[in-house]
Amino acid sequence: MGIQGLAKLIADVAPSAIRENDIKSYFGRKVAIDASMSIYQFLIAVRQGGDVLQNEEGETTSHLMGMFYRTIRMMENGIKPVYVFDGKPPQLKSGELAKRSERRAEAEKQLQQAQAAGAEQEVEKFTKRLVKVTKQHNDECKHLLSLMGIPYLDAPSEAEASCAALVKAGKVYAAATEDMDCLTFGSPVLMRHLTASEAKKLPIQEFHLSRILQELGLNQEQFVDLCILLGSDYCESIRGIGPKRAVDLIQKHKSIEEIVRRLDPSKYPVPENWLHKEAHQLFLKPEVLDPESVELKWSEPNEEELVKFMCGEKQFSEERIRSGVKRLSKSRQGSTQGRLDDFFKVTGSLSSAKRKEPEPKGSTKKKAKTGAAGKFKRGK
């Protein structure tokens, strides 16, 4: 779920924090991608006649086709992706996971009714609601990525929290996910729609946390409390407090504790055994991988092993897979050129980005840095 209504709220009250870019704008950028979110998108979108793709044994293959071709598209545009997979969900998420199970059970009933009535559109709608990323999906995608020469990481807990940690450490430029709580975990830059279907023609949305905080007049701890009031995966919110009211309350009272102290409990009853303090702590200090221990390497694809896996086991067209491998290899040759701003130490924020740093002599001959370009947030 992420944070309820956060994207719309930012668009309404801090529109300058959002920038829309074409995928070509990210040439030379390293990006940490929420793998489970991407796989879920592939299972929903990569279909034939409303059904997921399958091989002759009835095994789902939509996730593999999506991962293969979307990753190639990113590489062809000079993006260096690293996929981050979910680990064990935090205990605080158990309530949300239980609700999801209930919704799945209800969708199963509605699907059976739609099938009995022969309502094709309803069948497709409820079938998609039953989509769930499994361990097998994850394992197969990891195997595919290793054969493609694309790095992946296993997060100890929530993938988006580890993606945020990688951005904060300068290992990558941005975190790519549809879950807005990546900002709540402190990612300086969030990208949405990066792995969306090309046919949808959605521009990539880039959210800048520093500008969000600046426009709202909040610090990170206050922003976390705002997100908890909006509704997160880790605890309930106060019924009756909408996005606009939540912003006003946080701006005025600065913390959930002070808001609760001043609220009329008859109008805005606080949830029983409310775990907002625990959720607050989880967002500020999540369990994440150690960015300093991470070494990201992109290597040549293993064409024969890819053909063996994708064609021999999963029954994709050999001609298409070999063609994809050639595109991937060619893209690696083109992406070795670094971004210009990787050659300089650039500081500043969105508001100060117009100031130019003096160009050091011979700087164009220096080796490009591994990480993202300091605090400079332009996706050029």
From Swiss-Prot:
Region: Disordered, residue numbers: 327-380
Cofactor: Mg(2+)
Annotated localization: Nucleus, Nucleolus; Nucleus, Nucleoplasm; Mitochondrion
Enzyme class: hydrolase
GO annotation, cellular component aspect: chromosome, telomeric region; mitochondrion; nucleolus; nucleoplasm; nucleus; protein-containing complex
Binding-site positions, DNA: R47, R70, E158, G231, D233
Amino acid composition bias (Basic residues), ranges on this chain: 363-380
Keywords (A to Z) from UniProt: Acetylation, DNA damage, DNA repair, DNA replication, Endonuclease, Exonuclease, Hydrolase, Magnesium, Metal-binding, Methylation, Mitochondrion, Nuclease, Nucleus, Phosphoprotein
Binding site for Mg(2+) 2: D179, D181, D233
Official protein name in the record: Flap endonuclease 1
Organism: Macaca fascicularis (Crab-eating macaque)
Taxonomic lineage from the root: Eukaryota, Metazoa, Chordata, Craniata, Vertebrata
